[in-house]
C-alpha cells in the first residue's frame, strides 16, 4: 500500500533553539543543573526509582508550601491544571464559589468554575490593588460561598494579594480557600498551614526554574473531607485527587497506575526544588524582593510609571504603564530582535496598557535587573524617540 503523505522537509532541518533571556512573566530560564538532570535516561512510570523521585518531590513541595498535608502531589499539566484540579475536586453543580478578582486569573478561574457547574460570584479589587480583609469579609457575608478562590500573585496586573487571616475568616463561614501561587511562590511569603489554606498549586516554570508541564498541588484535611462528602464523582478523571494521590502514594494505599508521567519532567523539577531548598525560603524570597526594588527604582528614575499600587506589588512580575504614543509590541519586538531579551505586554485587563518584566529564579539577580533595564529603556526610545527616558543604565 502506498503512503501518499511524504516525510516533511522541515524535519530534515536541524532543531534550532536560540538562547534567549526570558525576562517576561514566565517561563524563566532553567539552570544548567536542571537541564542536565533532564538529559538522564527515561524511567518507567512505576519503576521504584521513579517512585523514589516522586517521594523526594513531595517532601520538597511540603517545604515550599510550608504544609504537612498528606494530599500533596504533582499533576502532569501546566499551572492551568492546578486551577482545574482544585476547582474540579471541590465544586459540584450549584455550589457557590466566590472569585477574588485582581486580574486575568480571576477571569480564568471564573470561566473554569462555570464549566464545572458552579454558581460563580465575583468580588473585584480596585485597579492595581489587592482585596482588603474587610472587602473579603463583606463578600463572604453577601454571597455565602462554599469556596473562595484567590490569586496570590496575579501576573497580568503585578498585584500581590494579602492572605494572612483569610483562611480563618473563610472557615468561620464554612467556606474553603483555594489559592493560586503560580507566579508568586518563592517570591513572596507563603504559609499554607498557618494561613489555613485548603487547596493550593504553583507552577514549575516560574521561580523554581523548571520546565512547564508539571504542577505541584496540595489539599488540606478540610479539603479532603469535603471531597469525601461529594454527592457526585469528580467530573474529570484526570484531575481526581484520590486517583492521582494514590499514584503519588499519599493516602497509605497501594500505588496505582493513573497515567504515564514524564520521568524527564520529574528529574528537572526535583533538582529545581532541591536548589530552592538549598538556598532556603527566607533567602530565596529576599533575593526576589531586593531585585524587584532595584527594578522599581531604575524604572522610576528613568521616568516610567508602575501600574500596581506600591503596597500591593508582586516581586516576580512588574507591570509598567505603556507611555503615551508607544507601541508596546514594537518595543518588545525590538528587545527580542536586537538582544534576544523577552519583555512582555499585558494580559487580559492589562492588554495594551502595560509592559511586564519578570524576575524569577536565576533571572532574579542584580546583573539581570540592570540588563533588562538597559534593554527596556533602549527599546522604548527606539520605537518612540520623542518619549523622554531620563537616563540609561
Swiss-Prot record:
Chain residues that bind L-alanine: 155
Modified residues (N6-(pyridoxal phosphate)lysine): 206
Temperature dependence: Optimum temperature is 60 degrees Celsius. Maximum activity between 50 and 80 degrees Celsius (for alanine and glyoxylate as substrates).
Top-level taxon of origin: Eukaryota
CDD domains reported in the protein's UniProt record: AGAT_like
Catalysis: reaction(s): glyoxylate + L-alanine = glycine + pyruvate
Entry EC number(s): 2.6.1.44
GO BP annotations, alphabetical order: glycine biosynthetic process, by transamination of glyoxylate; glyoxylate catabolic process
Cofactors named for this entry: pyridoxal 5'-phosphate
GO molecular function: alanine-glyoxylate transaminase activity; L-serine-pyruvate transaminase activity; pyridoxal phosphate binding
Subcellular location: Peroxisome
Tissues of expression: Expressed in head and abdomen of adult females.
Residues reported to bind pyridoxal 5'-phosphate: 78-80, 205, 257, 260
Pfam families referenced in this protein's UniProt entry, alphabetically: Aminotran_5 (PF00266)
InterPro entries recorded: Aminotrans_V_dom (IPR000192), Aminotrans_V_PyrdxlP_BS (IPR020578), PyrdxlP-dep_Trfase (IPR015424), PyrdxlP-dep_Trfase_major (IPR015421), PyrdxlP-dep_Trfase_small (IPR015422), SP_NH2Trfase/AEP_transaminase (IPR024169)
GO terms for cellular component: peroxisome
Broadest EC class assigned to this enzyme: transferase
Known partners and oligomeric status: Homodimer.
Family designation: Belongs to the class-V pyridoxal-phosphate-dependent aminotransferase family.
Protein name as catalogued: Alanine--glyoxylate aminotransferase
Lineage, uppermost ranks: Eukaryota, Metazoa, Ecdysozoa, Arthropoda, Hexapoda
Amino acid at each position: 500500500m502506498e503512503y501518499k503523505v511524504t516525510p516533511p522537509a522541515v524535519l530534515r532541518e536541524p532543531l534550532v533553539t536560540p538562547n534567549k533571556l526570558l525576562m517576561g512573566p514566565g517561563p524563566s530560564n532553567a539552570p544548567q543543573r536542571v537541564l542536565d538532570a533532564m538529559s538522564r535516561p527515561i524511567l518507567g512510570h512505576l519503576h521504584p526509582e521513579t517512585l523514589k523521585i516522586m517521594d523526594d518531590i513531595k517532601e520538597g513541595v511540603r517545604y515550599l508550601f510550608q504544609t504537612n498535608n498528606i494530599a500533596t502531589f504533582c499533576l502532569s499539566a501546566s499551572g492551568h491544571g492546578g486551577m482545574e484540579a482544585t476547582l474540579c475536586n471541590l465544586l459540584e453543580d450549584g455550589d457557590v464559589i466566590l472569585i477574588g478578582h485582581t486580574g486575568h486569573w480571576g477571569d480564568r478561574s471564573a470561566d473554569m468554575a462555570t464549566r464545572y457547574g458552579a454558581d460563580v460570584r465575583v468580588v473585584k479589587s480596585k485597579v492595581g490593588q489587592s482585596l482588603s480583609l474587610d472587602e473579603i469579609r463583606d463578600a463572604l457575608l453577601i454571597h455565602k460561598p462554599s469556596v473562595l478562590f484567590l490569586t496570590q500573585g496575579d501576573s497580568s496586573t503585578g498585584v500581590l494579594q494579602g492572605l494572612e487571616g483569610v483562611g480563618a475568616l473563610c472557615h468561620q463561614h464554612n467556606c474553603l480557600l483555594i489559592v493560586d501561587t503560580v507566579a508568586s511562590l518563592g517570591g513572596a511569603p507563603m504559609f499554607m498551614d498557618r494561613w489555613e489554606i485548603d487547596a493550593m498549586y504553583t507552577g514549575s516554570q516560574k521561580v523554581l526554574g523548571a520546565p512547564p508541564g508539571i504542577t505541584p498541588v496540595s489539599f488540606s484535611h478540610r479539603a479532603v473531607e469535603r471531597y469525601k462528602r461529594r454527592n457526585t464523582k469528580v467530573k474529570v478523571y484526570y484531575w481526581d485527587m484520590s486517583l492521582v494521590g494514590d499514584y503519588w502514594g499519599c493516602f497509605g494505599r497501594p500505588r496505582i497506575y493513573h497515567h504515564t508521567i514524564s520521568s524527564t519532567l520529574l528529574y528537572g523539577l526535583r533538582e529545581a526544588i532541591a536548589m530552592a531548598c538549598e538556598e532556603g525560603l527566607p533567602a530565596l524570597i529576599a533575593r526576589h524582593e531586593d531585585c524587584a526594588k532595584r527594578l522599581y527604582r531604575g524604572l522610576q528614575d528613568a521616568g516610567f510609571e508602575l501600574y500596581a499600587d506600591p503596597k500591593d506589588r508582586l516581586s516576580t512580575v512588574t507591570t509598567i504603564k505603556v507611555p503615551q504614543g508607544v507601541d508596546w509590541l514594537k518595543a518588545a519586538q525590538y528587545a527580542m530582535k536586537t538582544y534576544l531579551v523577552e519583555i512582555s505586554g499585558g494580559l487580559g485587563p492589562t492588554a495594551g496598557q502595560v509592559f511586564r518584566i519578570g524576575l524569577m529564579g536565576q533571572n532574579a539577580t542584580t546583573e539581570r535587573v540592570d540588563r533588562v533595564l538597559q534593554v527596556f529603556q533602549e527599546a522604548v526610545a527606539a520605537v518612540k524617540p520623542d518619549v523622554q527616558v531620563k537616563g540609561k543604565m
